[in-house]
Swiss-Prot record:
The keyword Ion transport does not apply. Belongs to the bacterial ribosomal protein bL20 family. GO terms for molecular function: rRNA binding; structural constituent of ribosome. It comes from the Bacteria. Keywords: Ribonucleoprotein, Ribosomal protein, RNA-binding, rRNA-binding. One of its GO terms (biological process) is translation. InterPro entries: Ribosomal_bL20, RIBOSOMAL_L20_CS, Ribosomal_protein_bL20_C. PROSITE patterns: RIBOSOMAL_L20 (PS00937). It comes from Clostridium tetani (strain Massachusetts / E88). This is Large ribosomal subunit protein bL20. The keyword ATP-binding does not apply.
């Protein structure tokens, strides 16, 4: 079997990893093995973070909507149920933006939800 010399491939791989680890402290930015471990961990954490970000924003929107609905005398779950019954199809991001930037319009949405719940 012929001998495989990996000079170019290995160099390319090492350069890629060391470029990704630029800015890391100490050997993590200079030594291939530790840099590779750090880069793998960083990429894994970045992937996880992108998934967690979606959950965190949803939690934030729900907390904001809940605070605004309670200020208008209704709980979050009853408000969402009332909106569904009223046929108002709005996502939580938009509802939270309205609650922050236009409280008057948000209180109208709460009234519409209350009306449907009482009917």
């Amino acid at each position: 079997m012929a001998r495989v010399k990996r000079a170019m491939n290995a160099r390319k791989k090492h350069k890629k990893i060391l470029k990704l680890s630029k800015g890391y402290f100490g050997g993590k930015s200079r030594l291939f093995k530790t840099a590779n471990e750090s880069v793998i961990r960083a990429l894994r954490n970045a992937y996880t973070g992108r998934k967690l970000k979606k959950r965190d924003y949803r939690k934030l929107w729900i907390a904001r909507i809940n605070a605004a609905t309670r200020a208008n005398g209704l709980s979050y779950s009853r408000f969402m149920n009332g909106l569904k019954l009223a046929g108002i199809d709005m996502n939580r991001k938009m509802l939270s933006e309205i609650a922050i930037n236009d409280p008057k319009a948000f209180s109208e949405l709460v009234e519409a939800a209350k009306k449907q719940l009482n009917a």
